[in-house]
Swiss-Prot record:
It is a multi-pass membrane protein. It comes from Hyphomonas neptunium (strain ATCC 15444). GO terms for cellular component: plasma membrane; proton-transporting ATP synthase complex. The gene is atpB. PROSITE patterns: ATPASE_A. Keywords: ATP synthesis, Cell inner membrane, Cell membrane, CF(0), Hydrogen ion transport, Ion transport, Membrane, Transmembrane, Transmembrane helix, Transport. Its main location: membrane. Key component of the proton channel; it plays a direct role in the translocation of protons across the membrane. The chain crosses the membrane at residues 27-47, 87-107, 117-137, 146-166, 196-216, 224-244. This is ATP synthase subunit a.
Length: 253
């Protein structure tokens, strides 16, 4: 068996599909670009097909789309309030892009774009930049009250304000790392169990019971990874709503 077949890291390698350069800048179209584009196309295609007819008695596909719409709307309303609903399109797009990217990664030989920190980090930075812009537009300099607990004595201000600033600056780091680490670790484990199963089967009949156990664990891990794919999209979206709520109501802190 080729060593590459058992290498759990090889699946994350970014490869060029189309070599493109703009002067000294490499703008090649890679497998990461392709699968991100595929995710966008699938999201648009799914909701376009589901809502094409807009029947009063919804079809199964339309029902799923409406459930997704209602789920995100309820999430935004509960975490960011009625005022946060103006950001529903952003949170909706973010959730389903991450969800479809995670699910695409579960297809054999597909590429998991969310297992790369450059992708999850870019998404996290987009969220935090939006939070800062919204906070400044909504509250002006009052946005900085977010870092100063109201009603606290001066010594507490001196201690807590730097902590609050560091905590805020760490948000994009933790937001991006959480998604990246979960997807990376999960796919490494899937690859290892699959590789062990094949290796044990090839080692002889005596190892068949152990291979069967490894296969069963791999199947269970696959089911868990589908759950993680949805859960991580939800966590990313709900934290986005929480951060937007902080920006919208900074003067309440």
């Amino acid at each position: 068996m080729p060593a590459i077949a058992l290498d759990p890291i090889h699946q994350f390698e970014v490869t060029k599909w189309l070599d493109l350069r703009l002067g000294n800048i490499d703008i090649s179209f890679t497998n990461a670009s392709g699968f991100m584009l595929l995710g966008v196309v699938l999201v648009i295609g799914f909701f376009s097909m589901a809502t094409r007819k807009g029947e009063l008695v919804p079809s199964r596909l339309q029902s799923v789309a409406e459930m997704g719409y209602g789920f995100i709307a309820d999430m935004v309303r509960s975490a960011a309030g009625e005022e946060g609903l103006k950001f529903f399109p952003f949170v909706f797009t973010l959730f389903f892009f991450i969800l479809f990217a995670n699910l695409i990664g579960m297809v054999p030989y597909a590429f998991t774009t969310t297992s790369h920190i450059i992708v999850t980090g870019a998404l996290a930075m987009t969220v935090i930049l939006m939070v800062i812009v919204v906070g400044l537009i909504k509250n002006g300099l009052g946005f900085f009250k977010l870092f100063a607990p109201s009603g606290a004595p001066l010594p507490i201000y001196i201690i807590l304000t730097p902590i609050e600033i560091i905590s805020f600056l760490a948000r994009p780091l933790t937001l991006g790392l959480r998604l990246f680490a979960n997807m990376l670790a999960g796919h490494i484990m899937l690859k290892l169990f699959a590789g062990f199963t094949v290796m044990l089967i090839g080692a002889g009949a005596i190892y068949i019971p152990v291979a069967a156990l490894a296969f069963a664990m791999g199947v269970a891990l696959n089911a868990l990874e589908f759950l993680v794919a949805g859960l991580q999209a939800y966590v990313f979206a709900i934290l986005t709503c929480v951060y937007l709520n902080d920006a919208l109501h900074a003067d309440a802190h």
